[in-house]
């Protein structure tokens, strides 16, 4: 596995979003607005971030 990590922050509310997008955000380990999660930098995680890119911000 890769040793690189990526930090993501939830910057937009989940109210009114699709259920699948809410599940993706939960899968990224994000709960509340402005919460930050540090994850392994893998293609699966990158795909999840890309799917909900309008809700999250990549910090590093």
From Swiss-Prot:
Keyword Ribonucleoprotein listed: yes
InterPro entries documented for this protein: Ribo_uL30_ferredoxin-like_sf, Ribosomal_uL30_bac-type, Ribosomal_uL30_ferredoxin-like
Record flagged with keyword Ribosomal protein: yes
Transmembrane segment boundaries: none
Keyword vocabulary terms for this entry: Ribonucleoprotein, Ribosomal protein
Disulfide bonds: none
A single GO BP: translation
One GO molecular-function entry: structural constituent of ribosome
Cellular-component GO terms for this entry: cytosolic large ribosomal subunit
Pfam family, one: Ribosomal_L30
Quaternary structure (record): Part of the 50S ribosomal subunit.
Protein name: Large ribosomal subunit protein uL30
Species in which this protein is naturally found: Paraburkholderia xenovorans (strain LB400)
Gene that this sequence comes from: rpmD
């Amino acid at each position: 596995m890769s040793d690189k990590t990526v930090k993501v922050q939830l910057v937009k509310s989940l109210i009114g979003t699709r259920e699948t997008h809410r599940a993706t955000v939960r899968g990224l380990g994000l709960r509340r607005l402005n919460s930050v999660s540090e994850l392994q930098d893998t293609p699966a995680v990158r795909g999840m971030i890309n799917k909900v890119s309008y809700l999250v911000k990549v910090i590093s």
